[in-house]
C-alpha cells in the first residue's frame, strides 16, 4: 500500500493565518489613508535602499518623517538636504548608466539629461517638465522630486524587464497569439506575464488532479490509502486573471501565485489564500506573505506598506511596477538556487505517477552510470571543458562568457563527451542565442553562451525519449499543489506521461537523502555534489559545478544507460532545450569520468572543504537567506556590509579582502550584484560562486577547475573598491592598470575551432550593442563592483577584436571612476543608450545582431563626444557653484570676525574656521598659478580666524607683504609653520588675556585720534578744495593715463544705472544672493607676470575679495581689460619693487553716504565683507562697478608697522582732492558707524609715520569724491523720476484723447444711424419701393462696413472703440436674441453666449477693422452663394459650408433651430413644436423669419422655388411673404452656428432666413405676444 499525504500541509495556511491573527495587524482605514504621504514614504524608501543598499541605509533616512510638537508630520531635514543636493539621484542613476557617463553625474541636470537620453522624461502631474530649478529650489518642491524618483524607478523597471524578455519567458511554458496578446507597453507586459503564469498554474493543477484521479481509479495500480479527504472533493485554488495592474493586484494573490510557480518550495500553494472573492483579511494575509517572502529571499525589495498594496492608489503605480519588474528579474534573470519553475516539474510528476514501477527507490547510482564513469575516454582537456562549461553555465548575467572564449561553446567539437548544454550551445549559438541576446534588454544575459532559458524560449525541439531526473523537490511539488506528500523521481519524456511511482519520502525529508548511501566513495561525492549543486550550479561559478550536477542519479540502470547512450547517439536532438533548461537532464552521468580519472577532491575543486550536510540544511531551512548560504559554503569571514561602506582599507590595501566578497550581496542577501555585467564567467565576479579564488592551490595548478588563468586573483577586489559609487575616491590609477588590458582568459589545453572564434568575435560586438546595463546597473552598488572584478582579473587576450576595442576604449576608463562598466573595456560604455521607450522596445529589430562593426565604432565615437561635452559643461557649472559657495562661506566668516573685533575682545565671538572642503573643491577648479595662492590664502585665513583677528603676528604680515617672497611655495611653507605654532586647538592657552586688553585699549586710543582728526580735516577743507594741483583726474579717462594702483574699488550706489563712473551696473538678485565683481585668477596671474612693478599680491587680492569670485567683471571706463597689467606707481616714484602694494577697496552705501576705504589686510577684509553684507541685506544696492583709476594710489609703507583707524566726517567736505591712499594692516577695527543716515562717515587707516594732516587730505579727497558721486546719483535719480512722471502725464493725456475720440465716433455713428433709419422709413412708405432699393447696396458698399457694424453698439449701450463689434459681449441675455443690440445693418449674427467668429475677422485690431469689413462684402460676393444665386452648381465657397442644393435644406434648418435659434432649456417647448412642424412638412426648402437684424426667431416658412411662394408653417408672422415684404436675406452656417447676411434682394434656394420690413411689424405691434409664447 502506498500512503499519499494529500493534505499533509493542508492546515499550514490555517496555522499561518492564526499566527498572523495573533499579530493583530492594524490596517489604516481608507478614509484615513494619505496616498500622498504614502507616495513620499515609498519613493524615499526605494531610492535610499538603491543608493545605499537596503541594509546600509543611514538610520535617519529609514523613516523620512518626524512629528513636531503640534502633531504635524514633516520630512526630516537630512532627507530634504539629500534631495536638494542630488546625491541620492546621482548614486541611483550611476547604477543604471554606463561607465564614463557616471562621472558627469554631479547635479540634478545631468541626471535629467541621462534619463532623457534613455527616453524617460521627468514630467509633473500637469505634464510640465521638471527642471533643475524645481529640484533645487528651497523650500523643497516635493512634487518635482517625486517625479524624479518615479523616473528613476521607470529606468530601473526598463532595465529589469522588457516586452522581449516577457515574451521569451512566457513562450517557454505557454503559448499565445502574437496578433492578439502581444504586449504593447511595460504595464501590459507585466499583466501578460502574471496572467500567463496564473493560467499555467491552473493548467498544472487541473492536470495533476486528473492524473491523481486516474491513479486512484486504475485497477492495476496498488491500492492507495488516503489520510485525508478524497482529492476530488477538494476545490482547486482560484488563480486570478488581471485586467488592471494596480486594481487587480491589490489582494496579492496573483503575485503569490507567480512566486509559487517559480519557487514552489519556498512558497507553498496551500499557504496562499487563493479565492475567487478575497476578503480584506485574506488580502492582508497575502500581502504580509508577499512581504515576508521578499524580505527573506528577494533582498527586501518590497518597499511598500500593507496599506499601499491594499489600496494601490494610482500614484503608487510606478512603485508597484518596479516591484513586479524586480520579481521578474529575480525569477527570470538571476534565478537563484531556490527558483524551480513549476513548468520544469509538471511532466516529471505526471510521468512518475503513471509509471510507478520503473523507478527503484533508494538506489543512488546505477550500474550503467558507474560504467559510464569508468569507461569514458576522457582526457584532462575534457575535464577542463566539462568544468569550464559547468562554471560557465552557472553564471546568469555573466554578460560575455562565451564571447571571450570562456563560455561553453568554446570547446572543440572533437571532444566526445560534451555535456548536453554545451552541445546545444554550440549548434544554436550563432542564430538563436544571438537573436535573443539582442532582443533582451541590458539585464538579460547578453553573451554568446546561450542561457538554457533563453534557448528554450525560442523553440521547443524534440529531446531524448528517456532521461534521468533528480528527485528535486518532487515531494513538495506535489504536496504544494494537491496535498500529496509523494517524493518523486522519474524517467521522463515528452511523448509519455506514464512513469512508475517511487517509494515516497516523508513530506519534509530533503531530496538528497538517498545520496548519503555512499558518502565515502567518489560516487558518493558526486551524489553529494548533485544534491548540493542542484540549483546553486545555475548561479555560481564553481570550478567543477555543472548544470548536470543537479541530476540525481538514483535511477534504474536501464533508464540511466538508455539515457547515456541516447545522449551520445543523438547530439542533434540535444541542441534543443525544449521546455526550459529545467526540463533537460542537467548533466548525464557520462560527464563524470574526467573528474574520476583525476580523482580531484571536492575540497580542491571548490577551493576549500565543503560541508556535507549543507544541502540538507538548506532544504530544511528553506527560509535561509541566500547570502547566508553563500557564507556557509565559502567559509568566508568577511563583513558582508563592506560593499556599501567606504572602505579606505580596500583602497589602500587591495589584497586584504577576498574576491569572494565581490560575488556576494554585501549584507543585503540580495542577488542583484551577483547578476552583474561581467565580462567573464569563470572569474566569478558576478555569479554566485561558492568557492574562493584564494583556494588552497593556485588556479593554474587546477586546469580541471575550468578557471581562467588570472595574473592577480585579487584584482577584482581592487577594481571594486575604486568603482564603489558611494565612495569619494577619485583615484583613477587603480583601475587604469586593470582596465588597459583586455580581460580575456583562455582555458588551459582548450582547442578553439576557427568557426567558434569567428562566432565569438561576432557576438562580442553584438553584445556591445545590448550590454549597457547588464550589470543590473539599477540593482545595487555591488553589481558594478562585480563587473569591475570581472574586467580586472585576467590580462590575457584571445581576440583581435578585443585588442582593437581595448585600444579604442582604454583611455575612456581613465576619465571617470564611479561606473559599473568603467573597467570593462568591452565597449559596453560606448554602446548607444538602450531603448527605453516602450514603442521602441516593441519595434526593436531582432536583426540588430548583424550590425556592422563600423557602425558600432561610429556610434561609440559619437556617444563619447557627447559624454565628454556634457562632462565639460557639468564641471564648469560645478566650478561656478563651488566658487559661489566658497564666497558665501567666507563672507559669513568675515562678518563673524568683524563682529568679534568690535565687541571689545569677547572671546566667545571668535570666528569659526573655514571648512576645508570648500577650499579643496575650489583648488581643483583653478589654474596652476592660482592653486598655490588659494591654498596659502585658505591656510592663512584659517590661522587668522583661529586666533583673535586683531592679534596677527608680525611674521604672518611679513609673509603676506614681503615683496621678496616671490615663491608661493615658500610663503605657504612659512604660513604652515605659523599655523602649526598657533594651532586653533591651543587658542585658549596661547592667547594672553592681557594682550587682548592692550589691543582694545589701543583701539580706543585710535578712535579718539580719529575724533580729533575730524576737526583738523574740517579746518583744512577750504584749502583742499582750492588746491588745483591736487584735483581728482577725470573719471572717464583711460586707466593707463594716470597713476594706477592695484587696489580694487567697489562702489555700490543706490541710484539707478547712469552715474558717470558706471556705464553698466549689475542688478542684485533677490537681495540675498549678492552679485559682486569677480577678480579673476587669470587676471591676477597675468598681472603678476607682465607688470614691471610689484602688482597686487595674489594672496592679498584673493583674501580681499573672496566673495566676489563668481561675478563677471563689469565694464566701466576706468577698468583695464583683463589682459592688461595693472601698473603700480608709488607716489614718490620710489622703487616699488621693494615695497609691496596692497589693494584696498571701498564700499559705498549711497543712502547713508558711508564709505569704507579699506586695505587688503585681514581686518580690512572683515570690515568690507561686513559692510557688503549690510548693503545687500538692506536691498538698496543697485549695482556694482569697479574702478582701477579713481585717483586713489597706494603709498608703499613698511608693513610691519601698525596703523590706526581714522574717522572722517564727510558732512563738511565739498571738493575732492587728489590724495594718495595708504593701506596698511591694522590690528583692530571698531564699528563706529553712525546710525544717522544724513551724515557721511568715512573710515581710513592712518600711518603713524605720516603727518595726520597729510593723511586727512588724502582721505578727504576720496571721501568728497564719493559724496559728489552720491549727489550726482541722487540728481540722476530725480531726473529719471521726472522723466517717468512726464511719461505718465503723456499716457494720461493720450488716454483722455482716446476717450474723447471714442465719444465723437459714437456720436457720429449715432447720427449716421438716425439718417439711415430715416431714409429706410421713407423707402418703405413709398408705393413703388421695389425699383428703388437697387442703388442702396451701392451706397452701402461705398461706406465702410464697420460703420454699420459699429452702429449696433449705440443700441446696446456698450462702449467700444473702432474695433469690429463683438456680438457676444453686447447681448441682452435673451435666449431668442442671437445678436440683440445689433442694427439692421449687422453683417453677421452669432448664436447667443459663444464667442463671435465672423467671416470678416471679428477679432481684428481697431486699425484693421474698416479695411477688413470693407473686404468682407467682396469676399462674400466672390466666395459665397451670392455668386451662385442663379446656379447653385457654381458654388465655390468654404469647404465647411453645406452647399445648398435643389434637394433640401431641411437638415440645415433643423440644425439652426436646434442649436442656434431656439437653443437652450428655456426654448425647449417652442423648439420641439417647431421641429415637429418641420418634420411633418414635405417641402424641400424652408425659411426662418426673424423679427429684425437681431435675428430673433419668429416663424418657420416653407419655400417653393418654382412658384416663389413662402408659406408659414408655424410661429408668429404673415401667412405668406411676398418679394415686396422682404428686407434682408440670411444664410446659415452649420459649422459656426450663426447666420450671415446675404448682400442680395432676390430670393433663392440658398436663402435660409429673412427679415421683413419693420413697418409690417409695427402695424401689428399691439398684438405681438411675448417671446416665451411664440409657438402659436
UniProtKB/Swiss-Prot annotation:
Q: Does the keyword GTP-binding apply?
A: no
Any coiled-coil regions, as ranges: 857-889, 992-1022, 1254-1315
Going by the entry's taxonomy, the superkingdom of the source organism is recorded as Eukaryota
- Annotated Calponin-homology (CH) domain ranges read 217-332
Q: Where is the composition biased (Low complexity)?
A: 554-566, 813-824, 1116-1131, 1367-1382
A GO cellular component entry from the record: cytoplasm
- Give start-end of the signal peptide: none
An example GO BP is: regulation of cell morphogenesis
Single annotated GO MF? microtubule minus-end binding
What is any Pfam family matched here? CAMSAP_CC1
Q: Which residues form the CKK domain?
A: 1437-1571
Bias (Basic residues): 1333-1346
Renumbered to this chain, region (Disordered) spans 415-447, 549-572, 595-653, 811-852, 1108-1149, 1178-1236, 1274-1422
Entry domain remark? The CKK domain binds microtubules.
The function of this protein is: Key microtubule-organizing protein that specifically binds the minus-end of non-centrosomal microtubules and regulates their dynamics and organization. Specifically recognizes growing microtubule minus-ends and stabilizes microtubules. Acts on free microtubule minus-ends that are not capped by microtubule-nucleating proteins or other factors and protects microtubule minus-ends from depolymerization.
What family does this belong to? Belongs to the CAMSAP1 family.
Protein name from the UniProt record: Calmodulin-regulated spectrin-associated protein 1
Q: Give the source lineage, highest ranks first.
A: Eukaryota, Metazoa, Chordata, Craniata, Vertebrata
Amino acid at each position: 500500500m502506498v500512503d499519499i499525504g494529500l493534505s499533509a500541509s493542508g492546515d499550514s495556511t490555517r496555522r499561518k493565518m492564526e499566527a498572523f491573527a495573533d499579530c493583530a495587524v492594524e490596517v489604516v482605514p481608507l478614509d484615513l489613508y494619505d496616498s500622498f504621504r504614502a507616495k513620499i514614504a515609498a519613493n524615499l524608501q526605494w531610492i535610499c535602499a538603491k543608493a545605499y543598499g537596503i541594509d546600509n541605509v543611514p538610520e535617519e533616512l529609514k523613516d523620512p518623517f518626524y512629528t513636531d510638537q503640534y502633531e504635524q508630520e514633516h520630512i526630516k531635514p537630512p532627507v530634504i538636504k539629500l534631495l536638494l543636493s542630488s546625491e541620492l539621484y546621482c548614486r541611483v542613476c550611476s547604477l543604471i548608466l554606463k561607465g564614463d557617463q557616471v562621472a558627469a553625474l554631479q547635479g540634478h541636470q545631468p541626471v535629467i539629461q541621462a534619463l532623457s537620453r534613455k527616453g524617460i522624461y521627468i514630467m509633473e502631474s500637469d505634464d510640465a517638465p521638471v527642471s533643475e530649478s524645481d529640484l533645487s529650489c528651497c523650500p523643497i518642491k516635493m512634487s518635482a522630486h517625486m517625479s524624479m524618483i518615479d523616473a528613476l524607478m521607470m529606468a530601473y523597471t526598463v532595465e529589469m524587464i522588457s516586452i522581449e524578455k516577457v515574451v521569451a519567458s512566457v513562450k517557454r511554458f505557454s503559448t499565445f497569439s502574437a496578433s492578439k496578446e502581444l504586449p504593447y507597453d511595460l504595464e501590459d507586459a507585466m499583466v501578460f506575464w502574471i496572467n500567463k503564469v496564473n493560467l499555467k498554474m491552473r493548467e498544472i493543477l487541473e492536470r495533476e488532479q486528473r492524473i491523481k484521479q486516474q491513479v486512484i481509479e486504475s485497477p492495476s495500480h496498488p491500492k492507495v490509502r488516503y489520510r485525508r479527504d478524497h482529492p476530488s472533493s477538494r476545490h482547486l485554488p482560484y488563480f486570478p486573471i488581471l485586467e488592471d495592474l494596480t486594481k487587480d493586484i491589490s489582494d496579492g494573490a496573483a503575485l503569490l501565485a507567480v512566486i509559487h510557480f517559480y519557487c514552489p518550495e519556498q512558497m507553498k500553494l496551500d499557504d496562499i489564500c487563493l479565492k475567487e472573492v478575497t476578503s480584506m483579511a485574506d488580502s492582508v494575509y497575502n500581502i504580509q506573505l508577499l512581504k515576508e517572502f521578499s524580505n527573506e529571499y528577494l533582498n527586501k525589495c518590497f518597499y511598500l506598506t500593507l496599506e499601499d498594496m491594499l489600496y494601490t492608489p494610482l500614484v503608487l503605480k510606478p512603485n508597484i511596477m518596479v516591484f513586479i519588474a524586480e520579481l521578474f528579474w529575480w525569477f527570470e534573470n538571476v534565478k537563484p538556487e531556490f527558483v524551480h519553475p513549476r513548468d520544469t516539474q509538471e511532466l516529471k510528476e505526471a510521468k512518475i505517477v503513471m509509471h510507478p514501477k520503473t523507478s527503484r527507490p533508494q538506489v543512488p547510482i546505477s550500474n550503467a552510470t558507474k560504467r559510464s564513469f569508468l569507461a569514458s575516454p576522457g582526457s584532462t582537456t575534457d575535464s577542463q571543458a566539462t568544468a569550464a562549461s559547468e562554471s560557465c553555465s552557472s553564471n546568469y548575467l555573466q554578460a560575455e562568457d562565451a564571447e571571450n572564449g570562456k563560455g561553453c561553446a568554446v570547446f572543440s567539437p572533437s571532444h566526445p563527451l560534451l555535456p548536453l548544454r554545451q552541445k546545444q550551445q554550440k549548434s544554436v549559438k550563432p542564430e538563436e542565442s544571438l537573436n535573443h541576446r539582442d532582443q533582451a534588454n541590458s539585464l538579460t544575459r547578453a553573451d554568446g553562451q546561450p542561457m538554457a532559458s533563453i534557448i528554450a524560449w525560442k523553440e521547443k525541439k524534440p529531446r531524448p525519449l528517456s532521461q534521468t531526473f533528480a528527485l528535486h523537490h518532487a515531494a513538495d511539488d506535489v504536496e504544494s499543489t494537491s496535498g500529496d506528500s509523494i517524493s518523486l523521481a522519474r524517467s521522463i519524456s515528452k511523448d509519455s506521461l506514464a512513469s512508475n511511482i517511487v517509494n515516497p519520502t516523508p513530506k519534509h525529508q530533503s531530496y538528497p537523502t538517498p545520496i548519503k548511501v555512499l558518502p565515502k566513495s567518489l560516487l558518493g561525492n558526486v551524489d553529494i555534489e548533485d544534491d548540493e549543486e542542484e540549483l546553486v550550479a545555475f548561479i555560481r561559478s564553481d570550478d567543477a559545478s555543472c548544470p548536470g550536477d543537479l541530476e540525481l542519479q538514483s535511477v534504474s540502470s536501464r533508464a540511466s544507460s538508455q539515457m547515456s547512450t541516447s545522449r551520445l547517439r543523438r547530439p542533434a536532438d540535444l541542441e534543443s532545450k525544449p521546455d526550459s533548461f529545467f526540463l533537460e537532464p542537467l548533466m548525464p552521468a557520462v560527464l563524470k569520468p574526467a573528474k574520476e580519472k583525476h580523482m580531484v577532491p571536492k575540497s580542491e575543486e571548490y577551493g576549500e572543504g565543503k560541508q556535507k550536510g549543507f544541502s540538507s540544511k538548506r532544504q530544511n531551512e528553506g527560509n535561509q537567506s541566500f547570502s547566508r548560504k553563500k557564507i556557509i559554503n565559502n567559509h568566508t569571514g568577511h563583513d558582508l556590509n563592506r560593499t556599501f561602506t567606504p572602505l579606505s582599507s580596500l583602497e589602500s590595501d587591495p589584497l586584504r579582502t577576498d574576491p569572494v566578497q565581490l560575488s556576494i550581496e554585501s549584507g543585503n542577501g540580495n542577488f542583484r550584484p551577483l547578476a552583474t555585467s561581467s565580462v567573464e564567467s569563470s572569474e566569478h565576479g558576478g555569479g554566485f560562486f561558492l568557492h574562493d579564488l584564494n583556494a588552497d592551490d593556485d588556479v593554474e595548478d587546477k586546469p580541471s577547475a575550468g578557471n581562467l588563468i588570472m595574473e592577480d586573483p585579487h584584482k577584482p577586489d581592487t577594481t571594486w573598491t575604486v568603482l564603489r559609487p558611494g565612495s569619494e575616491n577619485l583615484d583613477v590609477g587603480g583601475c587604469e592598470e586593470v582596465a588597459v588590458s583586455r580581460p580575456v582568459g583562455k582555458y588551459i589545453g582548450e582547442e578553439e575551432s576557427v568557426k567558434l572564434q569567428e562566432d565569438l568575435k561576432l557576438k562580442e560586438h553584438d553584445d556591445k550593442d545590448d550590454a549597457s546595463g547588464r550589470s543590473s546597473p539599477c540593482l545595487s552598488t555591488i553589481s558594478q563592483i562585480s563587473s569591475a572584478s570581472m574586467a580586472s582579473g585576467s590580462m590575457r587576450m584571445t581576440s583581435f577584436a578585443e585588442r582593437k576595442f581595448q585600444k579604442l576604449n582604454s583611455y575612456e576608463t581613465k576619465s571617470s571612476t564611479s561606473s559599473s562598466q568603467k573597467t570593462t573595456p568591452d565597449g559596453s560604455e560606448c554602446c548607444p543608450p538602450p531603448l527605453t521607450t516602450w514603442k521602441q522596445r516593441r519595434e526593436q529589430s531582432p536583426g540588430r545582431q548583424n550590425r556592422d562593426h563600423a557602425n558600432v565604432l561610429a556610434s561609440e565615437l559619437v556617444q563619447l563626444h557627447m559624454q565628454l561635452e556634457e562632462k565639460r559643461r557639468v564641471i564648469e557649472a560645478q566650478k561656478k557653484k563651488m566658487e559661489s559657495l566658497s564666497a558665501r562661506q567666507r563672507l559669513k566668516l568675515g562678518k563673524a570676525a568683524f563682529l568679534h573685533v568690535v565687541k571689545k575682545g569677547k572671546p566667545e565671538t571668535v570666528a569659526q574656521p573655514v571648512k576645508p572642503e570648500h577650499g579643496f573643491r575650489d583648488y581643483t577648479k583653478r589654474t596652476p598659478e592660482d592653486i598655490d595662492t588659494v591654498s596659502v590664502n585658505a591656510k592663512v585665513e584659517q590661522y587668522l580666524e583661529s586666533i583673535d583677528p586683531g592679534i596677527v603676528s608680525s611674521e604672518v604680515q611679513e609673509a603676506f607683504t614681503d615683496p621678496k617672497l616671490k615663491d608661493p611655495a615658500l610663503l605657504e611653507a612659512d604660513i604652515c609653520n605659523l599655523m602649526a605654532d598657533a594651532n586653533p586647538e591651543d587658542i585658549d592657552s596661547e592667547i594672553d588675556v592681557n594682550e587682548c586688553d592692550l589691543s582694545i585699549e589701543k583701539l580706543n586710543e585710535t578712535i579718539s585720534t580719529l575724533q580729533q582728526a575730524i576737526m583738523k580735516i574740517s579746518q583744512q577743507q577750504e584749502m583742499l578744495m582750492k588746491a588745483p594741483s591736487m584735483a581728482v583726474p577725470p573719471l572717464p579717462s583711460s586707466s593707463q593715463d594716470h597713476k594706477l594702483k592695484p587696489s580694487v574699488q567697489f562702489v555700490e550706489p543706490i541710484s539707478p544705472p547712469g552715474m558717470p563712473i558706471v556705464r553698466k551696473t549689475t542688478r542684485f538678485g533677490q537681495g540675498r544672493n549678492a552679485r559682486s565683481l569677480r577678480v579673476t585668477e587669470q587676471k591676477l596671474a597675468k598681472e603678476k607676470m607682465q607688470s614691471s612693478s610689484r602688482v597686487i599680491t595674489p594672496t592679498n587680492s584673493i583674501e580681499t575679495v573672496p566673495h566676489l569670485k563668481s561675478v563677471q567683471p563689469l565694464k566701466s571706463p576706468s577698468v583695464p581689460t583683463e589682459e592688461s597689467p595693472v601698473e603700480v606707481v608709488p607716489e614718490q616714484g620710489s622703487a616699488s619693487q621693494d615695497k609691496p602694494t596692497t589693494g584696498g577697496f571701498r564700499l559705498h552705501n549711497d543712502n547713508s553716504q558711508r564709505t569704507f576705504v579699506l586695505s587688503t589686510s585681514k581686518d580690512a577684509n572683515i570690515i568690507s565683507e561686513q559692510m557688503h553684507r549690510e548693503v545687500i541685506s538692506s536691498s538698496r544696492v543697485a549695482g556694482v562697478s569697479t574702478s582701477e583709476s579713481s585717483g586713489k594710489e597706494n603709498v608703499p609703507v613698511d608693513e610691519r608697522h601698525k596703523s590706526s583707524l581714522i574717522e572722517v566726517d564727510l558732512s563738511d567736505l565739498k571738493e575732492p582732492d587728489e590724495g594718495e591712499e595708504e593701506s596698511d594692516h591694522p590690528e583692530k577695527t571698531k564699528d563706529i558707524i553712525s546710525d544717522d543716515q544724513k551724515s557721511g562717515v568715512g573710515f581710513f587707516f592712518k600711518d603713524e609715520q605720516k603727518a595726520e594732516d597729510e593723511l586727512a587730505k588724502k582721505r578727504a579727497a576720496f571721501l568728497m569724491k564719493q559724496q559728489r558721486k552720491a549727489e550726482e546719483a541722487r540728481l540722476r535719480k530725480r531726473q529719471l523720476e521726472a522723466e517717468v512722471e512726464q511719461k505718465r502725464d503723456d499716457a494720461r493725456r493720450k488716454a483722455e484723447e482716446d476717450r474723447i475720440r471714442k465719444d465723437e465716433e459714437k456720436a457720429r455713428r449715432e447720427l449716421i444711424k438716425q439718417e439711415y433709419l430715416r431714409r429706410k422709413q421713407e423707402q418703405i412708405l413709398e408705393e413703388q419701393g421695389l425699383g428703388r432699393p437697387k442703388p442702396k447696396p451701392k451706397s452701402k458698399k461705398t461706406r465702410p462696413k464697420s460703420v454699420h457694424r459699429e452702429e449696433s453698439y449705440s443700441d446696446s449701450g456698450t462702449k467700444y472703440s473702432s474695433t469690429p463689434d463683438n456680438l457676444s459681449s453686447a447681448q441682452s441675455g435673451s435666449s431668442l436674441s442671437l445678436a440683440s443690440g445689433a442694427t439692421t445693418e449687422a453683417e453677421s449674427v452669432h448664436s447667443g453666449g459663444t464667442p463671435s467668429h465672423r467671416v470678416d475677422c471679428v477679432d481684428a485690431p481697431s486699425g484693421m477693422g474698416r479695411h477688413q469689413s470693407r473686404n468682407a462684402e467682396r469676399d462674400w460676393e466672390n466666395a459665397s452663394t451670392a455668386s451662385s444665386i442663379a446656379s447653385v452648381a457654381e458654388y465655390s465657397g468654404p469647404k465647411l459650408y453645406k452647399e445648398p442644393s435643389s434637394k433640401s435644406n431641411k437638415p440645415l434648418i433643423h440644425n439652426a433651430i436646434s442649436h442656434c435659434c431656439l437653443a437652450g432649456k428655456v426654448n425647449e417647448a417652442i423648439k420641439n413644436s417647431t421641429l415637429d412642424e418641420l418634420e411633418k412638412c414635405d417641402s424641400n426648402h424652408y425659411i426662418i423669419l426673424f423679427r429684425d437684424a437681431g435675428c430673433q426667431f419668429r416663424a418657420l416658412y416653407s419655400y417653393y422655388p418654382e412658384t416663389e411662394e413662402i408659406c408659414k408653417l408655424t410661429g408668429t408672422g404673415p401667412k405668406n411673404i411676398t418679394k415686396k415684404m422682404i428686407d434682408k436675406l440670411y444664410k446659415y452656417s452649420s459649422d459656426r452656428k450663426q447666420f450671415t447676411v446675404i448682400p442680395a434682394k432676390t430670393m433663392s434656394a440658398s436663402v435660409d432666413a429673412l427679415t421683413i420690413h419693420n413697418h409690417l411689424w409695427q402695424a401689428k405691434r399691439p398684438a405681438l405676444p411675448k417671446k416665451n409664447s411664440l409657438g402659436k
